[in-house]
Amino acid sequence: MKHDMTISWDRHLKNGNVWGVEVELSMQETPGDFYTYTVKVYVVAPTQALAQYIVATMYPDYEGIFVDDEPTRTAP
């Protein structure tokens, strides 16, 4: 199948459709020892709410999700 159009990462950035999202995930090395580490994820989505939903779906065992207030305009 031949596609009619390609939307590049740069175009998504220019249009304000890339959101930075920090995800706190728990890690357990031994019983009773809990650690949290943070992962920064960049998501293509038209809204902040959809970006949060996508990340919550990708990381269902998250401890916390923090979406940037504004879309990312430059490449990470």
Language model features: what each stretch is:
Residues 1-26:
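Short N-terminal "domain-start" leader segments
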Residues 26-35:
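Short, cysteine-centered beta-strand-loop-beta hairpins and adjacent loop/turn segments enriched
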Residues 2, 6, 58-76:
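Short, mixed-charge low-complexity intrinsically disordered segments
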Residues 34-47:
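A short, exposed loop/beta-hairpin motif centered on an aromatic-Gly-Thr core
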Residues 13-15, 45-49:
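A short, structured loop/turn motif at beta-sheet edges
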Residues 8, 40, 49, 74-76:
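Serine/threonine-rich, low-complexity intrinsically disordered segments
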